[in-house]
Amino acid sequence: MTHPPDTIVKSILSHISNPCDIQKLSLQDKLTLAEELRSIIIKTVSNNGGHLAPSLGVIELTLALLATFNPAEDKLLWDVGHQTYAWKLLTGRAHNFSTLRKLNGLSGFPKITESQYDHFGAGHAATSISAALGMAMARDLQGLKHHVIAIIGDGSLTAGMAFEGLNQAGAMGRRLIVVLNDNEMSISKNVGALSLFLSRNMERGWVRRVRHEIKDWLKSIPSIGDEVAEYASRTHRSLKTVFTPGILFEAFRFNYIGPVNGHDIESIEKHLAMAASIDDQPVLLHVLTKKGKGYEPAEKNPASYHGLGAFDIQTGIPKSNSQNSPPTYTEVFGKTLCELAEKDKRIVTITAAMASGTGTSLFKAKFPTHFTDVGICEQHAVTFAAGLASQGYKPFVAIYSTFAQRAYDQIIHDVCIQKLPVTFCLDRAGIVGEDGATHHGAFDISFLRCIPNISILAPRDEAELQSAIYTALSFNSPLAIRYPKGNGVGVTLPNESTPLPFEGELLKEGHDAIIIAIGSMVMPAYSAAQQLQEEKNLSIAVFDSRWISPLPQHQLIELANTFNNILLIEENALAGGFSSAVVELFADNQCLHGQRIQRIGIPNYFIDHGSQKELKQCLLLTVDGIKKMLLQMLQPE
């Protein structure tokens, strides 16, 4: 285990005023600095939460990169970017690293507006190679000579976009370095043929030695030695795939180097220099790292320490989440799906490298033949599900709202046009908190409700989520169920659920105004209405639309013709979202007759990082925010 922060005898980091200062350090100083970085990262993440295991695994690689390249000139692009904590500490942000992932603090990902050394923003996987190739082409067009380096993990390399980038880079032959950070993990354990390919015969030094010894021995044979050795070399090219993972990348016309010990700074620097010296084709340097390196709990269970909240350093146990808290929406989803699968063997579950995050690990354990983790391949996941649905199965695609964006064409082309009964379970819909703009589930209502043939359902609590899963089983067409990150509201879960009706529900009667809300905003709206009745004697009605597409039209039209003050609330982008759909319905049915209509939702700009509570307060997506808006609406003109 790494030393606690207060036991670091000598601070090297405090003397790093410029990233290039690392090039002046001795090897021993770099090793000391690596320990210092580990201690700071562990301490900070234990307080703030964050992506611990990925960042601990690349500290030596980060130091070697900065010892070899000049980030003021060379372009270094980190794929996904959740492993860049050491990078941030070494590129001028050590003084405010304690603000990591906090409101108005440092982002947990590369961000071009945060530092000149963050050359390309990230958050989603597999973008680095394509972006780096674009930068390499721009460099060549301008006649410049700097290096462009993409650092990508083996998890990201399961994504099709990474191979599209490799394919184009090889065809173009641009001078480009790709560093493959191979820790045999993405978030969940890596899957697919590529993972098996990379993990085969990693320690290949003996292979090289044996090959050279055999070749030397063959050459020593009198008369025919050279001829036999040449034949053996040709045969070796055919057999190379047995021993060499690099053959895959060489097929893409990359010069393959490695694998290299990713925690041996000296060795990494040597091989990075070798890669930098090759100027006639792209290069891939294969680096082997250990996720969670230096913190024993993270080394033993890297998936649990991939991304986590605040925790106790000594035990590794999370600090929050009281045992008395309601179950999370994710947990309710996973448990309910397993209950249904016990009764209906048509149910299959698909996730994209997020089994633990989407709550499907339990399903995987109980029904392994009906579970598929496709890796970071959202496009494939959706069309794979469509194929299953076409053969009579009931596929549930468990995916974060933000990652569903990556499969938009497949949702339309392969599922909705054919009206196949695929259920999209959109976890983390709405504001997710500290991961920021790349991870908020802000757009799913907007990009889904314009598609024909798909229904969209947003349960208001964990009991309704349970019912929504039951509803999906009775559906014979596409369905999306969206639900937020975090704990439920604390309602009792029934032992047996029934499908939800195709209508909304009036939860509270009133006459001064009505709140029409959806999903996660229904219960805050109800609380706000109750409080205003007690505090201000205001009579506020509350309607849970429940369905976004199709809307409960007759109910909404009746409400529009009844109330003069209407507040529409959603945890989604206002542009094209639920409230837009309701106002369109009112306009199309001549229901607009001078009412005051206000909307609360996510405005038309990208929401930065901060806690869910803080961000929702800023956006009025809270009980107090709703009360404030209602009081403004009800003021006399």
Swiss-Prot record:
Organism, as annotated: Lawsonia intracellularis (strain PHE/MN1-00)
The task this protein performs is described as: Catalyzes the acyloin condensation reaction between C atoms 2 and 3 of pyruvate and glyceraldehyde 3-phosphate to yield 1-deoxy-D-xylulose-5-phosphate (DXP).
Which reaction equations make up its catalytic activity?
D-glyceraldehyde 3-phosphate + pyruvate + H(+) = 1-deoxy-D-xylulose 5-phosphate + CO2
What is the top EC class of this enzyme, as a single word?
transferase
Cite the binding residues for thiamine diphosphate.
82, 123-125, 155-156, 183, 295, 378
Q: Does the keyword Magnesium apply?
A: yes
Assigned protein family? Belongs to the transketolase family. DXPS subfamily.
Question: What InterPro entries does UniProt report for this protein, alphabetically?
Answer: Dxylulose-5-P_synthase (IPR005477), THDP-binding (IPR029061), Transketo_C/PFOR_II (IPR009014), Transketolase-like_Pyr-bd (IPR005475), Transketolase_BS (IPR020826), Transketolase_C (IPR033248), Transketolase_CS (IPR049557)
UniProt keyword annotations, A-Z: Isoprene biosynthesis, Magnesium, Metal-binding, Thiamine biosynthesis, Thiamine pyrophosphate, Transferase
Q: In which pathway does it act?
A: Metabolic intermediate biosynthesis; 1-deoxy-D-xylulose 5-phosphate biosynthesis; 1-deoxy-D-xylulose 5-phosphate from D-glyceraldehyde 3-phosphate and pyruvate: step 1/1
What would you give as a GO molecular function for this chain, any one?
1-deoxy-D-xylulose-5-phosphate synthase activity
| Name the record gives this protein | 1-deoxy-D-xylulose-5-phosphate synthase
GO biological-process terms attached to the record: 1-deoxy-D-xylulose 5-phosphate biosynthetic process; isopentenyl diphosphate biosynthetic process, methylerythritol 4-phosphate pathway; terpenoid biosynthetic process; thiamine biosynthetic process
Tell me which NCBIfam families the record gives.
dxs, PRK05444.2-2
